[in-house]
């Protein structure tokens, strides 16, 4: 738990030297009874840590592209004062000060005087989180494993940042689109699909990953559906046995499978996907980032798997 005290009644003479710390501390309470009249709000993150906010934060650092996309989508871009070097959507996010990614720069974060740091669990180091706690900088950790987690995070951030109306509206729109896509594909066959997350070694997605859930929602059968991990390794014997009818490669400037590695799959001539030329590409940003555009990724998966259900076809 990050316990930060809101100090009241500071003498006017100390206002200057206390200003940076006060900006971080403003709105963060301990929930003590004598402060109950401020009606603090409690938020529990995906590490089961609690933070208490009396008002919406006004200086936020985002440590993930997906989180940055959520903040822009719900109208909190003005409060966003720091991002990672991979926060590139929407384009104006590139103009925000950078604080690192897998190894965030603590000094850069401190210089921005944030009153909230939003971070993904994936790359978060315990020592880094401990340093934030020592500095009394509140951090809220997000770890989306399902589409519902993504929607829940959007609504939680909306409540936290005073953007409930826009966040709830966004989540409702996303749920409606998901329902529409499921309805289109519900009665259709479920072709076998391999999603190549990494080539060497061959890594795909399994139960426990939201990309697996996207494949299922789109009407496909993930050949790694029996895997015991969210991102299992496969050998070619397993792939040949499952015989995928579709092979999908993520592509992008940062994450993705290079064209040369995609072409290597042509050698496996007994695979149904190779025989029929059913190789497809999908933007890694749409499916690897658990943010608002995940529904766009779902629709592309659905168009790949069931082109007959859509007027606009996606060509291999």
Each language-model region and where it sits:
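Extracytoplasmic substrate-binding proteins
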Residues: 49-50, 59, 116, 126-203, ...
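Short helix-initiation/N-cap motifs at beta->coil->alpha
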Residues: 44-48, 97-107, 227-236
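A ligand-binding cleft/hinge motif common to bilobed small-molecule-binding domains
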Residues: 123-134, 246-263
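Bacterial N-terminal signal peptides
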Residues: 1-9
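A short, structured surface patch at a secondary-structure boundary
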Residues: 58-112, 116-122, 223
């Amino acid at each position: 738990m990050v316990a930060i005290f809101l100090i009241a009644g500071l003498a006017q003479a100390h206002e200057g030297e206390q200003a940076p710390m006060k900006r971080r501390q403003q709105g963060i309470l301990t929930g003590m009874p004598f402060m109950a009249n401020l009606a603090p709000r409690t938020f529990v993150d995906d590490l089961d840590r609690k933070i208490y906010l009396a008002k919406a934060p006004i200086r936020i650092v985002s440590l993930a592209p997906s989180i940055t996309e959520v903040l822009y989508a719900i109208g909190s871009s003005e409060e966003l004062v720091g991002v990672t070097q991979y926060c590139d959507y929407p384009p104006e996010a590139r103009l925000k000060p950078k604080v690192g990614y897998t190894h965030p720069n603590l000094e850069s974060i401190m210089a921005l005087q944030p009153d909230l740091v939003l971070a993904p669990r994936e790359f978060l180091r315990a020592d880094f989180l401990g340093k934030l706690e020592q500095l009394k900088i509140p951090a809220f950790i997000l770890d989306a494993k399902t589409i519902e987690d993504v929607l829940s995070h959007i609504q939680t951030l909306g409540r936290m940042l005073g953007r409930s109306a826009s966040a709830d509206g966004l989540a409702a729109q996303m749920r409606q689109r998901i329902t529409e896509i499921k309805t289109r594909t519900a009665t259709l066959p479920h072709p076998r699909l391999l999603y190549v997350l990494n080539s060497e070694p061959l890594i795909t997605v399994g139960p426990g990953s939201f990309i697996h859930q996207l494949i299922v929602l789109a009407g496909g059968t993930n050949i790694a559906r029996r895997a015991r991990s969210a991102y299992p390794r496969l050998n070619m014997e397993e792939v040949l046995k499952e015989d995928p009818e579709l092979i999908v490669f993520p592509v992008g400037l940062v994450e993705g499978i290079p064209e040369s590695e995609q072409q290597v799959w042509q050698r496996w001539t007994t695979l149904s996907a190779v025989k029929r030329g059913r190789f497809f590409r999908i933007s890694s940003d749409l499916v690897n980032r658990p943010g608002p555009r995940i529904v766009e990724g779902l629709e592309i998966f659905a168009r790949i798997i069931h082109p007959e259900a859509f007027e606009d076809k996606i060509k291999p």
